[in-house]
Amino acid sequence: MSATQKPAPPLGLAFIAAVLKKAGHSVQVIDCVAEAPDVYYSFKDGVVINGLSDKDIVDRIESDVDVIGFSIMFSGNWIHNRTLIDTVGNKFQNAVIIAGGEHISACPEFCFKQTTFLNVCVIGEGEETILELISAIQEEKDLSNISGIAFRSKKNEICFGTKRTRIRNLNELPRADWSYFPIDKYKEKNMAFGINTQDSISFPILATRGCPYTCTFCSSPQMWGTRYFMRTPQDVADEMEDLVTVYNSNNFDFYDLTAIIKKDWIIELCKEIINRDMNITWQIPAGTRSEAIDSEVADWLYRSGCKVITYAPESGSKEILRTIKKKIRLENMLNSIKQSSSRGLNVKINFMIGFPGEKHIDIIESIWFLIKASWNGANDMAPAAFSPYPGSELFNQLSNEKLIDMDDDQYFMDIINIDTFFENNFYNNNMSNYWLRFYLIFYLFIFYSSNFIFRPLRFFKTMYNIATKRYESRGEMTLGELINRSKVKIIDIPH
């Protein structure tokens, strides 16, 4: 459980449910968080799980099930998911156990090694793969002819199919099907990662897939590849309009890796939203191509209801940006931040600290960038400790240097703790963990103190928004969530 984020409807599962339903399969979805949103229990080493217990999950699975799938996007979830996989697999030994998601795609052999009952790993996009896989299971065919999977053979050998070709025409895919999910619970408990959704529900949207960039800390190439494909603005707006009609949604959170690459595309989407008079709000990440956000784009974003835009410089040091292959120009980003803020958008920036090779001088340059970003109008900032994700270039480098041991659960605990300040370990040999933890806190201090100095009234507005739960920024929502989590009662459940 993240201490700083609210649960959100699981978009990946909704895509898989949609293609299975269209193919005529009987589908059951267990949304483990939304079905028990008020339950928090201790798992291990201070990790707290929000949602159904393993026993409750097993009890909800239909007895005649043929295939059971797990969505595992984040490596930080693995230490619980591996236990759950074997608990479920032990109970339903005649069912085929499948897992997919970014973590699975990055390290399938490791996932097989750490579980007993996992049968198949889906690597990369799952919509086409899952249909072929289910068909082969039903007809008892050899799985070796299926692209995009790894599987455990009857001899307990790990076998790989060929790499699956990326899905190019995203418009042809069925839209995420939310009919299998307890959306009323998300609305009742305000469980969605959107801004100002107290009276409605925020839905995740994916308008594009892939990222053409190759940042060394990112694992997305294992899941999506580096080819970039877009839905048409009309198709995206159609989906948003349908969700407004069916679920009375008034907010949308775009999950794209790099949402804005083509200026014409984002302007066309804004026009579609305005012309349909949907009366919604939405949030979007700028991605690496921040120069695409000029005054014209920022104006269209604001007019269409976009409230929050997120930039991800990761560092204010040109040397660090070069080593992590983050292809941005800091001055262009500062100008884009200024344009977005001046048009009324809430601007959030993401920062990381503790990259291998990072030095004190790089930290000082980052601090100076934070001050300039604050001056240019950024009003929200999320710092995180660098953590090497499986499948990323930096992960492979550190693994080769014997600095990562995935068999040691401490590696996964460090991933869980990336947004905390006192428990994370770093992979930096130039500064001690104590220095880096200090800098992590100082990033927050220098950014928000300069922000309130430049705009004194904002402090009081922030306090009011948190008190009334009318959040206008990610930072306000995070602080409000931390306050709510401090009141949570944690129970002990036997494992």
Residue ranges and their predicted role:
Residues 25, 89-95, 116, 140-142, ...:
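Short helix-capping segments at alpha-helix termini
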Residues 31-36, 222, 256, 351-353, ...:
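Residue-level recognition of beta-strand->loop/alpha-helix junctions
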Residues 64, 393-398, 406-495:
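Radical SAM enzyme core and accessory elements
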Residues 8, 171, 176-348, 368:
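Radical SAM [4Fe-4S] cluster-binding motif and immediate context
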Residues 36-38, 108, 213, 263-264, ...:
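Flexible glycine/acidic-rich beta-alpha junction loops that bind and position SAM and/or redox cofactors
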Residues 2-13:
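Glycine- and acidic-residue-enriched helix-capping/strand-helix junction motifs
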Residues 110-114, 297, 357-372:
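Catalytic cores of alpha/beta
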Residues 19-20, 28-169, 391:
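Glycine-rich beta-alpha loop elements in corrinoid/cobalamin-binding modules
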